[in-house]
From Swiss-Prot:
Keyword Membrane among UniProt keywords: no
Biased composition (Polar residues): 146-161
In-chain residues carrying the UniProt-annotated modification Phosphoserine: 688-689
Gene Ontology MF terms in the entry: RNA binding; RNA polymerase II CTD heptapeptide repeat kinase activity
Protein's job: Required for pre-spliceosome formation, which is the first step of pre-mRNA splicing. This protein is associated with snRNP U1.
GO terms for cellular component: commitment complex; nucleus; spliceosomal complex; U1 snRNP; U2-type prespliceosome
Pfam families assigned: FF, WW
Descriptive protein name: Pre-mRNA-processing protein prp40
Biological source species: Schizosaccharomyces pombe (strain 972 / ATCC 24843) (Fission yeast)
Gene that specifies this protein: prp40
Length: 695
C-alpha cells in the first residue's frame, strides 16, 4: 500500500504543481502553480481564494480557466441555474434572460474539442476517490484546482455554479494511481489526523499570525514533525487553517476578556453613589484609581470608553424616565380635562384659574413634570374636540329642527288639501275667511313661529295650484260658451248658464276633468269682468263730464265783466251760452252744476277775505282806545309777580266769537240757496278742483 500524499518524502519544497489531466494526447508536464484556489462555503457555494493577496471572488479567475472556459467567458451570454436547478441564460450587455440556450452559446459548445472532453472525463474518474472539500472546511478556506464532474450533456459540464468542484491535489513524479490507496499509514490514517498533528507542531513552536509561510518554512523545515504532512501544498493549506483558527481563538478570547472587564467595570460604577450622567472622567479616575476592576483594563482609552458607554446609558435612562413621566403627567392632565366641565370656547386664562383651584391638579405630583407648553397644547386639543362635538351637536339639532319643521309644513299642506276637498278653499277664498276655520287646529299652531314658509305662504301656494288648474281647463268651458253662443254680463242668469254648460260638456271626452265648481268659477269671472268693464265705462263718462264742467267753470271765471257772487244762473245764461264749453255740455244739469260750483268758490273766497279783515281789525291799535289805555300802563297787566287780565280782552274775544258764528250761518244759508237738487249727485259726490281732481 502506498503512503498518503501528505507523507510523501520525494518532493522538494520549491517544486510547483502538475496537472492531473490525462488523455490520449495529454502528456504529463510540470507547470507553475496558480495563487488562486477553489473553495466551497458551508452551503456548498464555490468561490475562489488567492493565497497571496488573500482576496476572494465568486467568478472563476482567468488563471484557472482552460482555453474553452476562456472562450465562454468572452461571450455576452452567461449560464445560470435557478433554486430548483433549472438552467437559464443571461446577456450581460442587453440584460435579457431566456430559458432556451442561445445560438451563440450553442455554437461555442459544439466547437468544444473532443480531446478536451475526454480529458475532462478521465480527470473526473481520477478524482472520484479524493477527499471531499468539507474535510478541511472547519479550519479555513478550502483551496482546490478547477475540475468538472460528469454530466449528461455538454452544457451541463461547463454550467457556472451548477457542477461540483473537487480538490485537485498535486501528484508526485511517481504518478500514484489513486489517492484512496495513499490514505493508509502506520501513524495517520486520515488527512484530518495528519492535519491535527501539524497544528500541534506549529503551536509547539509558537507560530502566530505575524508569521508568513515563507518564514515558517525557513524556521521549521529542519524541525521534527514538520514533515508529518509530506505534500508541501497540504502543509500550506494546513498552515492557513492554523492561522485562521489562531485568529478566531484570539478574537474569542479578546471578546470574553472585554465582556468580563465591561461587566466588572459597570458593576464598579453602579456601586458608587457619586457617578451620575453629568460626572466627568477625572472624577471617576480619582475615585476608582485603586479599584481592581478599574485597573483590570488594558489602557486608559479602554477605561474611558467603558465609562462613556455607562454614562451614555445613564443619559438614555434619564431621558426615557423623563419621557415616561411627561407621558404619565400628560395622560393625567388629559383625564382631568375630560372630567372638568369646560365650554367649547373657554379661554386658557379661565382654565388656568380653575386648575389652580382644583385639588386633582394641585395634589398630583406628576404635574410638576408637565411643561406649560404641553399643557397648553393638550388644552387646545381638548377645546378643539369640544368645538367639534358642539358643532356636530348643533348640526344634529338643526337637522332635527328642519325635519320637524318639514313635517309641520307637510301636515299643514294636508290640512289645506282636506279643506280644498271639502270646498272650503276655492279660488275666491280669502285668508280672512279661512283663518277662523284653522286658528285652533294643532297643525296650524305647530307651524307658527318656525322658519321657512308661513301658513299664509302655503295658503297662497294652494290658491296658485287652483289657479293653474283653472287656467288649464277654462278653455274647454269657453269653447262651450262659444258653441252655445252664450254671452255673460251683469244681468245674465248664472245658474241657468252653468246647467247648460254642464249638459254640453258631458258629451265631450275632456269633460271628466271639468267639475261644476270650475264651470261656476269661469262663469262668475266672466260676469265680474263684464261688471268691471261697465263700471270702468261709467267712471270714464263721469271723468269726461267733470272735465267739461271744470272747463265751463273756468270759462265763466274769465268772463268780462266778472260775474258777481249774487248773480243767478238765469241771469248769466245768455252770456255763457255762446261759449264752446257751454255747448260741449249737452245736459242743462251739468251746465248749472258748473255755474253753482263757480258761485260757491267765489263766495268761499269772499268769506276768507272777511275773516282776514277781522283778524287785522283785532290787532288795529289806532281804533281801540282801551288798548291804548292799557298799553300806557306800565308792565301792561303784570304787577307784583302775577298776571292780570283786562275786562276788554274778554269782551273782544266774545265779539269775535259772535262775528264768527254769524259768518258761518250766512255761508250755510248761501250754500243752501245756491245748490240745486237736479245736480246734487254730481256736485256733492264728485266735486272737482280747477285741475279736474276729485276731492
Amino acid at each position: 500500500m502506498s503512503a498518503p500524499p501528505w507523507q510523501t518524502s520525494e518532493y522538494d519544497e520549491t517544486e510547483g504543481f502538475t496537472s492531473n489531466q490525462e488523455g490520449p494526447s495529454a502528456a504529463p508536464s510540470k507547470t507553475v502553480a496558480s495563487d488562486w484556489h477553489e473553495v466551497k462555503t458551508e452551503d456548498s457555494r464555490v468561490y475562489y481564494y488567492n493565497s497571496v493577496t488573500r482576496k476572494s471572488v465568486w467568478e472563476k479567475p482567468e488563471e484557472l480557466m482552460n482555453d474553452f472556459e476562456k472562450k465562454l467567458s468572452k461571450l455576452a451570454w452567461k449560464e445560470y441555474a435557478t433554486a430548483d436547478g433549472k438552467k437559464y441564460w443571461y446577456n450581460v450587455n442587453t440584460r435579457e434572460s431566456v430559458w432556451d440556450i442561445p445560438d451563440e452559446y450553442k455554437a461555442a459548445l459544439v466547437d468544444e474539442p473532443e480531446q478536451q472532453k475526454k480529458a475532462l472525463s478521465s480527470k473526473i474518474k481520477s478524482n472520484d476517490n479524493k477527499p471531499a472539500v468539507q474535510s478541511i472546511q472547519r479550519h479555513g478556506p478550502d483551496v482546490a484546482a478547477p475540475s468538472s464532474q460528469p454530466a449528461k450533456d455538454q452544457s451541463q459540464q461547463i454550467s457556472q455554479g451548477s457542477h461540483k468542484r473537487t480538490i485537485n491535489f498535486v501528484q508526485q513524479k511517481d504518478k500514484r494511481q489513486k489517492r484512496s490507496n495513499d490514505y493508509q499509514h502506520e501513524n495517520y490514517d486520515t488527512y484530518e489526523a495528519a492535519e491535527r498533528a501539524f497544528f500541534k507542531f506549529l503551536d509547539s513552536h509558537n507560530v502566530n499570525p505575524s508569521w508568513t509561510w515563507e518564514q515558517t518554512v525557513r524556521e521549521l523545515c529542519d524541525a521534527k514533525g514538520y514533515y508529518v504532512m509530506k505534500d508541501p501544498w497540504h502543509r500550506k493549506c494546513a498552515f492557513d487553517a492554523y492561522i485562521l483558527n489562531y485568529l478566531t481563538d484570539q478574537s474569542d478570547a479578546e471578546k470574553n476578556r472585554v465582556t468580563k472587564i465591561r461587566k466588572e467595570f459597570i458593576e464598579m460604577l453602579k456601586s458608587s453613589d457619586k457617578i451620575h450622567s453629568y460626572t466627568l472622567w477625572r472624577t471617576v479616575k480619582n475615585e476608582f484609581s485603586s479599584h481592581p476592576a478599574f485597573n483590570a483594563t488594558s489602557s486608559e482609552t479602554e477605561q474611558q470608553q467603558l465609562f462613556f458607554e455607562y454614562k451614555q446609558k445613564l443619559l438614555e435612562d434619564e431621558k426615557q424616565l423623563e419621557k415616561d413621566r411627561r407621558k404619565e403627567a400628560l395622560d393625567d392632565f388629559c383625564s382631568l380635562l375630560r372630567n372638568m366641565n369646560f365650554e367649547p370656547y373657554t379661554r386658557w386664562s379661565v382654565a388656568q384659574a380653575k386648575f389652580d383651584q382644583d385639588p386633582r391638579y394641585t395634589r398630583n405630583s406628576n404635574m410638576k413634570y408637565l411643561s406649560k407648553l404641553d399643557a397648553l397644547v393638550a388644552f387646545e386639543d381638548h377645546v378643539k374636540h369640544l368645538e367639534r362635538e358642539y358643532i356636530l351637536d348643533k348640526q344634529k339639532q338643526k337637522k332635527e329642527k328642519h325635519r320637524i319643521e318639514r313635517k309641520n309644513r307637510d301636515a299643514f299642506r294636508a290640512l289645506l288639501q282636506d279643506l280644498r276637498v271639502q270646498k272650503k278653499i276655492t279660488l275666491r277664498t280669502k285668508w280672512k275667511e279661512l283663518y277662523p276655520i284653522i286658528k285652533d287646529d294643532p297643525r296650524y299652531l305647530n307651524l307658527l313661529g318656525q322658519s321657512g314658509s308661513t301658513p299664509l305662504d302655503l295658503f297662497w301656494d294652494t290658491i296658485v295650484d287652483l289657479e293653474n288648474m283653472y287656467r288649464e281647463k277654462r278653455n274647454l268651458v269657453l269653447d262651450c260658451l262659444e258653441v252655445l253662443q252664450i254671452s255673460v254680463d251683469d244681468t245674465s242668469n248664472i245658474p241657468e248658464i252653468i246647467a247648460r254648460l254642464s249638459e254640453k260638456l258631458k258629451d265631450r271626452e275632456e269633460s271628466e276633468a271639468v267639475t261644476e265648481d270650475l264651470i261656476e268659477e269661469v262663469v262668475n269671472r266672466l260676469r265680474d269682468k263684464a261688471i268691471h268693464k261697465k263700471a270702468e265705462e261709467k267712471r270714464a263718462d263721469e271723468r269726461r263730464i267733470r272735465r267739461k264742467i271744470d272747463n265751463l267753470r273756468s270759462a265763466i271765471k274769465y268772463l268780462k265783466p266778472p260775474i258777481s257772487a249774487d248773480a243767478s244762473y238765469d241771469e248769466i245764461r245768455p252770456l255763457i251760452s255762446i261759449l264752446p264749453e257751454f255747448a260741449a255740455l249737452h245736459s242743462e244739469e251739468h251746465r248749472m252744476a258748473a255755474f253753482d260750483k263757480y258761485i260757491r268758490r267765489l263766495r268761499e273766497k269772499r268769506e276768507l277775505e272777511k275773516q282776514y279783515q277781522n283778524r287785522r281789525g283785532y290787532y288795529d291799535v289806532g281804533k281801540d282806545e282801551s288798548y291804548l289805555a292799557n298799553s300806557a300802563r306800565p308792565h301792561s297787566g303784570y304787577e307784583d309777580g302775577r298776571l292780570e287780565y283786562s275786562a276788554d280782552l274778554a269782551s273782544k274775544s266774545n265779539r269775535n266769537e259772535i262775528n264768527t258764528m254769524q259768518d258761518v250761518q250766512e255761508n250755510s244759508i248761501s250754500h243752501v240757496t245756491a245748490t240745486q237738487p237736479a245736480v246734487k249727485n254730481i256736485v256733492d259726490d264728485a266735486e272737482s278742483s280747477e285741475e279736474g281732481e276729485i276731492r
